[in-house]
């Protein structure tokens, strides 16, 4: 497919997509009703031809988004605040970036520099006390990473744990505790209680009197599970207190739903595994900076006499095609498109190639040779935050989605 024309299929959907329930896996009924109305005014197409076009568009769009089937998010799906904040930081919108910096979140420059996809995973609520350890001091977490595509190469992974300030004891502000993260090398059933076989991945000595998220590098374990296809027995988290006055072991580190502080915020404060990967298509998640968010519509200045090749406004609203149930952000974006004449002689501002100049020259004396065409000459990427077909939250960079410049080619 010609680069730059992929996203134009979204617009073409409103002209060609029509089919029965058997072909509705990607485009829901709301979008198809709009298409049917448009086709009714345009004369429509034969049913068989429309079904075939629908299948072709569906397969192409699924491949473009890296999905096996259309996501059908459940009502219980949770979008971690971290992923929303990461999207805002990556999008580079100044007003939102200032708000995020106010809560102390920093953009992960190093992991993101080698990735075009960020995925988040919650453990499967299969929380187990590790045999032989102190009560509530060590836990094992199982993260199901089977939804990561085979062609996606993981470069790094991190485990995020939320910890709350400890205010128990007369000298609580002098205390420290250590958080150790291990990879479980063998399942608990195969080892003697109290002697779980693990390897240390990361450790941190933290002060009691701070409330914040802690990030731990678990890349070695995740790379073993994804690249080397080794069995995934999960991660073990151990909290060791170094202060003489005993506190409620582990209860200030949010690794359990049954904390006395309440479970209403558990969905946002539970442990989060984040992977950074690249599927081999396009560039990494480079951080963009923009002064202001682009408005939904950009009316062009009146150019009654100028019909030459130029960029025109084209806003793609994901709700129009029924994708707003699984695309979290953005709600839509300004894609733009190129349209206009490429008259002889070609002016410098039409951004023409030498071949286009020669072709236009020949066309001026031989009309059987077509004129040069007005096409995109520069395209840029957008970031999308969405729920995949497994209800996992994904932040992905998609190339060639926005027309930045047009020219005669």
From Swiss-Prot:
Residue list for modification Phosphoserine: 91
InterPro entries per UniProt: BMP4_TGF_beta-like, Cystine-knot_cytokine, TGF-b_C, TGF-b_propeptide, TGF-beta-rel, TGFb_CS
Residues bearing carbohydrate: 144, 209, 351, 366
A GO MF label: chemoattractant activity
UniProt KW keywords: Chondrogenesis, Cleavage on pair of basic residues, Cytokine, Developmental protein, Differentiation, Disulfide bond, Extracellular matrix, Glycoprotein, Growth factor, Osteogenesis, Phosphoprotein, Secreted, Signal
Signal peptide from the UniProt entry: 1-24
Organism the protein comes from: Bos taurus (Bovine)
Subcellular location: Secreted, Extracellular space, Extracellular matrix
Keyword Cell wall biogenesis/degradation: no
Gene Ontology biological process terms in this record: blood vessel endothelial cell proliferation involved in sprouting angiogenesis; BMP signaling pathway; branching involved in ureteric bud morphogenesis; chondrocyte differentiation; deltoid tuberosity development; endochondral ossification; glomerular capillary formation; heart induction
PANTHER family the record matches: BONE MORPHOGENETIC PROTEIN 4, TGF-BETA FAMILY
Region (Disordered): 284-308
Function: Growth factor of the TGF-beta superfamily that plays essential roles in many developmental processes, including neurogenesis, vascular development, angiogenesis and osteogenesis. Acts in concert with PTHLH/PTHRP to stimulate ductal outgrowth during embryonic mammary development and to inhibit hair follicle induction. Initiates the canonical BMP signaling cascade by associating with type I receptor BMPR1A and type II receptor BMPR2. Once all three components are bound together in a complex at the cell surface, BMPR2 phosphorylates and activates BMPR1A.
Gene Ontology CC terms, in alphabetical order: extracellular space
Domain of life: Eukaryota
Disulphide bridges, residue numbers: 309-374, 338-406, 342-408
Family: Belongs to the TGF-beta family.
Full protein name: Bone morphogenetic protein 4
Main location: secreted
Propeptide feature: residues: 25-293
Isomerase in keyword set: no
Assembly information from the UniProt record: Homodimer; disulfide-linked. Interacts with GREM2. Part of a complex consisting of TWSG1 and CHRD. Interacts with the serine proteases, HTRA1 and HTRA3; the interaction with either inhibits BMP4-mediated signaling. The HTRA protease activity is required for this inhibition. Interacts with SOSTDC1. Interacts with FBN1 (via N-terminal domain) and FBN2. Interacts with type I receptor BMPR1A. Interacts with type II receptor BMPR2. Interacts with FSTL1; this interaction inhibits the activation of the BMP4/Smad1/5/8 signaling pathway. Interacts with SCUBE3. Interacts with TGFBR3.
């Amino acid at each position: 497919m010609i680069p730059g024309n992929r996203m134009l299929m979204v617009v073409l959907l409103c002209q060609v997509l029509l089919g029965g329930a058997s072909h509705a896996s990607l485009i829901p009924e709301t979008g198809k009703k709009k298409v049917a109305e448009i086709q009714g005014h345009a004369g429509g197409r034969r049913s068989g031809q429309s079904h075939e076009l629908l299948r072709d568009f569906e397969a192409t769009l699924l491949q473009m988004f890296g999905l096996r089937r259309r996501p059908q998010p459940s009502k219980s799906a949770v979008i971690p605040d971290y992923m929303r904040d990461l999207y805002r930081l990556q999008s580079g919108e100044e007003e939102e970036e200032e708000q995020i910096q106010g809560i102390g979140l920093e953009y992960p420059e190093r992991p993101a520099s080698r990735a075009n996809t960020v995925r988040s995973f919650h453990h499967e609520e299969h929380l187990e006390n590790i045999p032989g350890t102190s009560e509530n001091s060590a836990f094992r977490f199982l993260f199901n990473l089977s939804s990561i595509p085979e062609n996606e190469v993981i470069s790094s992974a991190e485990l995020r744990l939320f910890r709350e300030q400890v205010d128990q004891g007369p000298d609580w502000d002098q205390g420290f505790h250590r958080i150790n993260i291990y990879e479980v090398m063998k399942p608990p059933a195969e080892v003697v209680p109290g002697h779980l076989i693990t390897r240390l991945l990361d450790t941190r000595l933290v002060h009691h009197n701070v409330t914040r998220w802690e990030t731990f590098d678990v890349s070695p374990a995740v790379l073993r599970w994804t690249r080397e296809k080794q069995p995934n027995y999960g991660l073990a988290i151990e909290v060791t207190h170094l202060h003489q006055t005993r506190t409620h072991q582990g209860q200030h580190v949010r690794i359990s739903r049954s904390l006395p502080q309440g479970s209403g915020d558990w969905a946002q404060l539970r442990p989060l595994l984040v992977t950074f990967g690249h599927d081999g298509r396009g560039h990494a998640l480079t951080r963009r900076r923009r002064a202001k968010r682009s408005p939904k519509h950009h009316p062009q200045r009146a150019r009654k006499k100028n019909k030459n090749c130029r960029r025109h406004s084209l806003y793609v609203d994901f709700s129009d095609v029924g994708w707003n149930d699984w695309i979290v952000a953005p709600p839509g974006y300004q894609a733009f498109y190129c349209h206009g004449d490429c008259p002889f002689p070609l002016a410098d501002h039409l951004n023409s190639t030498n071949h286009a100049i020669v072709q236009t020259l020949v066309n001026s004396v031989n009309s059987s040779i077509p004129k040069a065409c007005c096409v995109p000459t520069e395209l840029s990427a957008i970031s999308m935050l969405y729920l995949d077909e497994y209800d996992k939250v994904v932040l992905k960079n998609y190339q060639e989605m926005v027309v930045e410049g047009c020219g005669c080619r």
